[in-house]
Amino acid sequence: LRYIEISGEPSAKSVMVTEQADNAVRNVTLDGVVYTSIFNPTDGRKNWKDIVIAFCTAFQDVHDATLVLKMTNHSLASFLGELHFYFQQLGSFKCRIVALHGFMEAEEYEKLIAATHFYVNASKCEGLCLPLMEYMACCKPAIAPCHTTMADYIDSSSGLVVDSNLEPCILPHERCKVFGAMRYRINWESLANAYRQSYNIVKNKPETYREMAKAASLQIKKFASSIVVKEKLKIFLTKELGCSF
């Protein structure tokens, strides 16, 4: 597992990460208010540029805010140059970004979830977003839009909803490059404000945070628990195939 750390200072709380190049064990410290997002950087839907730039803008003068970007693409080159370019454009900032690249052992991944306060999604469209659901199931509130499939489990009780609006788009496999579909454009200001609001909640409103965390877990339980999925599948099979149970 490789990691790239931008800004920030070490503290007592840490996550152990193995550096693949020399097999040495390094400490990646995660303290203060921690945000996490997991995505393939080559997937244009994920809109991670807004995640990074809104974070650095919202917390330009905040030293104890950390954004963890867990990259799922096999190639380090899939994001490193682009991420570095964003930093050049942003100028100086006191907040911290940690980019993780490579496989994480289960224990390391669980520590990352435990250290996280909010999971961040700024996608233009989603088919499900399993990492978001996983973090919410572990009582981590979301900063995310309420569109496409996320509309099934994102609401204001379990996170901070980012505003979005429809815009035309070209399907990835469209040879003629015509606008044949729609997606959602994220409201950047809304995302930046959600960062600021979430930070204030963690720092000054612990009871509000606990309620959001509990609601996040409950939302996923109502949407995708084994009992719920089993019942939905049973209804579908009975209706469409005439199966009896």
Segments predicted by a language model, with ranges:
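A charged, aromatic-enriched C-terminal amphipathic alpha-helix characteristic of glycosyltransferases
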Residues: 182-193, 203-235
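A short alpha->beta transition loop at the rim of the catalytic pocket in nucleotide-sugar-dependent
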Residues: 117, 139, 146
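Aromatic "clamp/platform" in nucleotide-sugar-dependent glycosyltransferases that forms part
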Residues: 124
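Short acidic alpha-helix that forms the nucleotide-activated donor recognition element
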Residues: 104-116, 133, 137, 170-172
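Nucleotide-activated donor-binding/catalytic signature segment of Leloir-type glycosyltransferases, i.e.
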Residues: 77-111, 118
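Short hydrophobic beta-strand element within catalytic cores of glycosyltransferases
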Residues: 141-144, 160-162
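Conserved donor-binding/catalytic core segment of Leloir-type glycosyltransferases
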Residues: 24-46, 52-55, 67-69
